[in-house]
């Protein structure tokens, strides 16, 4: 089966590195893209990315596959998964939302985010209005994102995290 892994906020394709060998060993064909302005894809660096720009490369990827794919999305990647399911329903076998946003029609992440009063991300997120990006300060990343990770994985992630384009969430 084709599986497309969609990373969440501030991350890139790199965040799946521990999962990939297990899925390949199970015989799956994996597609692990960096979303625009994430990971190694720095074509857009100022955050002016809407949902269309974020989903377009994945639509092209789905269009090239010979069979429907499973989508596995983490965190804010759930927004992308839902949009793909609407745009290419015949190309998607199933969607797995792994601690991901699955919003109601018309709901925005910002709306959902305001309701989640206990969220550590909500408490610590820093929004850079000039670049339309958001990020988390390094001193709260372990507590907020990596509480169950070993120190080596935390350091790896810290070295690879990037600012998140905020526009798709607004």
Predicted regions and their residues:
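Glycine-rich His-Gly loop
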Residues: 6-9, 74-75, 100
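Active-site loop/oxyanion-hole signature of alpha/beta-hydrolase fold enzymes
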Residues: 29-31, 35-70, 86-87, 110-114
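Flexible "cap/lid" loop of the alpha/beta hydrolase fold
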Residues: 86, 91-129, 165-169
């Amino acid at each position: 089966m084709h599986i497309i892994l969609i990373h969440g906020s501030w991350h890139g394709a790199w965040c799946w590195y521990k999962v990939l060998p297990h899925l390949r060993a199970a015989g799956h064909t994996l597609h692990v893209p960096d979303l625009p302005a994430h990971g190694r894809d720095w074509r857009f660096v100022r955050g002016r990315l809407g949902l269309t720009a974020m989903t377009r490369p994945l639509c092209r990827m789905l269009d090239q596959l010979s069979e429907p794919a499973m989508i596995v999305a983490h965190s804010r990647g759930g927004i992308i998964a839902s949009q793909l399911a609407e745009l290419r329903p015949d190309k998607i076998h199933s969607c797995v939302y792994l601690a991901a946003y699955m919003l109601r029609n018309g709901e925005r992440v910002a709306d959902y985010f305001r309701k989640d009063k206990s969220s550590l991300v909500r408490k610590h997120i820093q929004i850079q209005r000039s670049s339309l990006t958001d990020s988390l300060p390094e001193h709260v990343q372990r507590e907020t994102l990596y509480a169950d990770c070993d120190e080596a994985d935390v350091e790896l992630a810290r070295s690879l995290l990037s600012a998140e384009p905020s526009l798709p969430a607004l």
